[in-house]
A protein has these predicted regions:
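Hydrophobic alpha-helical membrane-insertion segments
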Residues: 14-29, 90-108
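Interfacial/capping segments of alpha-helical transmembrane domains
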Residues: 26-42
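Perimembrane loop-to-helix junctions flanking transmembrane segments
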Residues: 37-55, 120-124
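Juxtamembrane non-transmembrane "cap" segments at the membrane-aqueous interface
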Residues: 99-123
Length: 170
């Protein structure tokens, strides 16, 4: 197997694993994240009481799942192709972007309510669970950052190992 073929195999594996794990983690996020009660009135909707901790907890759950996935998947990809960390980095970053998008898409779609439609058709106040959302945009880059950090640590470890073996060889 050629070097380019091995690198492309790691990249394809990263994309596939990122997509599948992102879809699965979207379901996990949907089940773990707390919901904020939303009061829907004719023509308007607003949170029932101000509850920023609900949004913060949903974002924290999203970020924690993303970091765990980034570390685990990057370690798995590095085991596939440890001698060429650049392809591992590309695969891990692609897995992070695709996995984060899939996780967000599934988590926000499951259990969501058409708030505007409900508001237009209701005649009394209705309390529903607000759909999940990521309030802090920084959560979207947690998976790629965790992946890049793992590759950086692996590269640093390889470099330190090479420096030590070069010093012993003198």
């Amino acid at each position: 197997m050629t070097t380019a073929r091995k690198a492309s195999a790691v990249i394809i594996a990263g994309v596939v694993v990122g997509l599948v794990s992102g879809l699965a983690l979207g379901v996990v996020w949907w089940r773990l994240a707390p919901r904020v009660p939303l009061v829907v009135q004719p023509g308007a909707s607003f949170p029932q009481g101000y509850q920023p901790e609900g949004y913060l907890a949903a974002d924290a759950a999203f970020g924690a799942l993303a970091v765990i996935a980034g570390v685990a998947i990057t370690i798995g990809l590095a085991n596939m192709r440890r001698e060429h960390l650049f392809s591992v980095l590309i695969a891990a970053l692609l897995a992070g972007v695709i996995g984060t998008a899939a996780m967000w898409w599934v988590g926000t779609r499951l259990g969501s309510v058409d708030i505007q439609g409900l508001s237009a058709t209701t005649t009394t106040d209705v309390v529903v669970d607000a759909p999940l959302k990521v309030a802090m945009p920084g959560m979207y880059v947690m998976w790629p950052i965790a992946s890049a950090l793992v590759v950086t640590i692996l590269a640093l470890g390889d470099w330190i190992s090479e420096v030590r073996s070069a010093r012993r060889g003198r």
